[in-house]
Design a protein with these regions (language model features):
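Hydrophobic, aromatic-enriched alpha-helical segments typical of multi-pass transmembrane helices
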Residues: 2-240
Length: 240
């Protein structure tokens, strides 16, 4: 059983943050919806593997080309910016040092993803490949596309995944010591992001990562509810 009360570890009286909480709540809700859309797209239209396959996909359907190169994942990370800011504001009084570190890791992870995503470049190369007059020109564009895909699946992407997961684990640990968010929210955050790092388990890593998305989706739903409560100046104190 739970009851609503004015929390003592956040500035509910400071209405300056209410808009941020509302924006973060909307962002988290949109992200939860996008996760479902991404799963459907992944099942119905598995992403290509080679540069030439991406070129053909862009030529057939540009939108599917961008979606295959994680357009919605980029949008997720844009929406993560207000979410991280709101989490910092809500939890900074519980442990400001941890929250500064977590926010910094999260923003570096977002920047790494933005820097590594090759969607626009691959779209341009696809158009040039289609317009090429000779086989030599087409080979040149194919040779340019493969390194882009390799780089995207390389250091920057993994840095984004690792830093983002660590950031949300740290934030979730801080949640455990706060009455601002439920314990269930904290545990979902820890579980989903620890499992995400299971990507590096040989052979089954990708399946562990995909499994983690279920718990991440639940986490987004729970933080959505909490942000909307905070936007009203309320927090949930869970009786355990």
């Amino acid at each position: 059983m739970s009851q609503l009360k004015q929390p003592d570890d956040i500035d509910v009286a400071d209405t300056r943050w209410h808009l941020l909480y509302r924006v973060a709540g909307i962002s988290a809700l949109i992200t939860a919806a996008l996760i479902l859309v991404q799963m459907i797209i992944f099942i119905l239209w598995p992403p290509p593997i080679t540069a030439i396959d991406y070129f053909k996909l862009f030529q057939d359907n540009s939108l599917l080309g961008f979606l295959a190169l994680d357009l919605l994942y980029v949008v997720d990370n844009v929406l993560l910016v207000p979410i991280l800011l709101a989490l910092y504001v809500a939890l900074r009084r519980t442990n400001v040092s941890f929250m500064i570190v977590a926010a910094a890791l999260g923003f570096v992870g977002i920047a790494a993803l933005f820097a590594s995503n090759p969607a626009v470049s691959m779209h341009v190369l696809s158009a040039r490949y289609a317009a090429a007059a000779t086989e030599a020109q087409r080979s040149l564009y194919m040779a340019a596309g493969e390194p882009m895909l390799a780089l995207y699946a390389g250091t920057a992407y993994h840095l984004s995944l690792i830093l983002g997961s660590i950031a949300l684990v740290v934030i979730s640990v801080v949640m455990l010591r706060s009455r601002t968010f439920t314990k269930a929210t904290a545990y979902m955050g820890i579980l989903s992001n620890v499992l995400a790092l299971g990507l590096y388990v040989p052979r089954i890593g990708i399946y562990i990562l995909l499994f983690s998305i279920i718990f991440l989706w639940v986490w987004y739903i729970l933080v959505t509810r909490s942000f909307f409560r905070l936007a009203q100046g309320l927090s949930q104190d869970v009786m355990q």
